[in-house]
A protein has these predicted regions:
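Active-site-adjacent loop/helix surface patches within enzyme catalytic domains
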Residues: 2-128
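Acidic helix-start/capping segments at beta-turn-to-alpha-helix junctions
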Residues: 131-132
């Protein structure tokens, strides 16, 4: 079983969605120097950005927004006929400093956590592999 901690962000649509609407997993990396600065941004109402899950460097998983709500991670997006993918996806941020701060590969703990979390979400929401 994949365990995670709750870490609240106010940045999400207040209307609940049905689980049957979830059909995509979208992965991002933070591109910020520290986990602290990334989490601060994800929780700052001025930033208007969030995600459902955040994978820390040590592999710990934080749930930022409950799955039943729409987080703000995909912006103005589309895939095939679907538009505004925030409505139909789970957003997962993996902490990585990115190209501006000496990019490094994702570490073993992060990879294990993302695989485990993804497997849980794929099974729970019946997400097709081509929708990841």
């Amino acid at each position: 079983m994949t365990k995670f901690q709750n870490f609240y962000s106010p940045n999400f649509d207040q209307i609940k969605r049905r689980s049957s609407n979830i059909k995509y997993l979208i992965y991002h990396y933070t591109g910020m120097e520290s986990e602290r600065s990334a989490l601060k941004r994800l929780c700052d109402t001025k930033s208007k950005v969030s995600c459902h899950y955040f994978i820390k460097k040590n592999g710990k998983i934080l749930q930022i927004v409950p799955d039943s709500y729409i987080s703000w991670h995909a912006g103005k997006s589309c895939w095939k006929k679907d538009k505004m993918l925030n409505k139909s996806s789970i957003g997962i941020e993996i902490h990585n400093s990115g190209h501006n701060f000496n990019y490094t590969n994702f570490n073993k703990n992060q990879i294990i956590s993302i695989k485990n979390l993804s497997n849980v979400l794929i099974k729970k929401y019946r997400i097709k592999k081509v929708m990841i």
